[in-house]
């Protein structure tokens, strides 16, 4: 008799980037009265909530350092490993860099799940590292009450081409490289409401490496770049706006989304992170419908890149996207700050 399939999501209270501590609570945790250590070679720290730290090692080269880890968002161990690795490596691409090495972070409930299952998880992470052209060079593990996997990733970038989330300019168009709705579809699967024709869509979206980010870095007109993960599109766009001193207009109908997300929202397939996200930054957003809120605040795991692009660089961005098999269209634009308007406004 065959043993029953393992459902990893049943062993964790959270899922993927939806496990993130909310922005509001995180602000309290990170607040400090201590004087910060100043290092002139640290080009990007945590002041602007960027995707990774960047350190200038000289000769125009910066070292990128980042880490990301979470609990299972899918049941299959190998796919969990793939998704966790893709998500962690993405932060390097979001800074405009190329990954060169990774080490694993593993928490495993050894009294509940066999080590052979953890091996499959690590194999999934190793597979993605090979796709990215890097070694999974080591790691650290602990006995934990819930399964956790992530990577600490090192990358390199030209110091002239670092893409921060705080350098966007008014007049930039906004582009998004992956569709929204990952949290919604994975919640539908967890609730056994996912239709057969939609199985695997979210997983394959999450497993797409954000490699184009390393190529977008060569375009000066890409003024800011970040990846859309646990805080949802509105959360990560608000970080760009606040860091850059600009405001945004989003065209809801132009935003790419996974199939049938509106139907799944109507069926109650909304992750808990959506509400926590809105509670943290909803006061910054203009009027929007409940449906728009559920999609735009949906926590993404291993989501796409969000780019702010000057008008004269749009063609270059679209050309690079085409080389990677993507077709990109603007989903909104950035405007000068105006206290009479919301930080982000949603139009049809």
Curated annotation (Swiss-Prot):
Cofactor dependency: Mg(2+)
EC identifiers of the protein: 2.7.9.3
Coiled-coil residue windows: none
Keywords from the named record: ATP-binding, Kinase, Magnesium, Metal-binding, Nucleotide-binding, Selenium, Transferase
BP GO terms, sorted: selenocysteine biosynthetic process
UniProt binding sites for Mg(2+): 51, 91, 227
Stored HAMAP family: SelD
Function: Synthesizes selenophosphate from selenide and ATP.
Name of protein: Selenide, water dikinase
